[in-house]
Amino acid sequence: MSQMDPDAVSKAFVEHYYSTFDTNRVGLAGLYQEASMLTFEGQKIQGVQSIVAKLTSLPFQQCKHHISTVDCQPSGPASGMLVFVSGNLQLAGEEHALKFSQMFHLMPTPQGSFYVFNDIFRLNYA
């Protein structure tokens, strides 16, 4: 397998993650594994089913993420990647967008793609 450009991989991942979140949250299940952990506004959730249950139970049906920045670094000897995202979250029917930050720790799969090992999400109230 050729060496992948971390910036290109992280950009493609971010585009896929948020377009899926905005249109079909259940479809995010394939990006997590049983060892994956989500910390959502301080609440720690582990495992695919629990993470998807949390994301699909959020109190809004429609939203649109607008990404401002994507930063990435290689992480550790297992060819993982840290991806840090900031942007705005526009909820349907709301006038003002919410600022958010999200960090993903991506780990490679044997099939040559990546899964989300860690995911930390925070709204930025400032």
From Swiss-Prot:
Residues 9-123 form the NTF2 domain. The modification N-acetylserine is found at S2. Keywords: Acetylation, Cytoplasm, Nucleus, Protein transport, Transport. It comes from the Eukaryota. The keyword Cell inner membrane does not apply. It is found in: Cytoplasm; Nucleus; Nucleus envelope. InterPro entries: NTF2, NTF2-like_dom_sf, NTF2_dom, Nuclear_transport_factor_2_euk. Its main location: cytoplasm. One of its GO terms (biological process) is protein import into nucleus. Expressed in roots, stems, leaves and flowers, and, at low levels, in siliques. One of its GO terms (cellular component) is nuclear envelope. Facilitates protein transport into the nucleus. Interacts with various nucleoporins and with Ran-GDP. Could be part of a multicomponent system of cytosolic factors that assemble at the pore complex during nuclear import. Interacts with RAN1. This is Nuclear transport factor 2B. It comes from Arabidopsis thaliana.
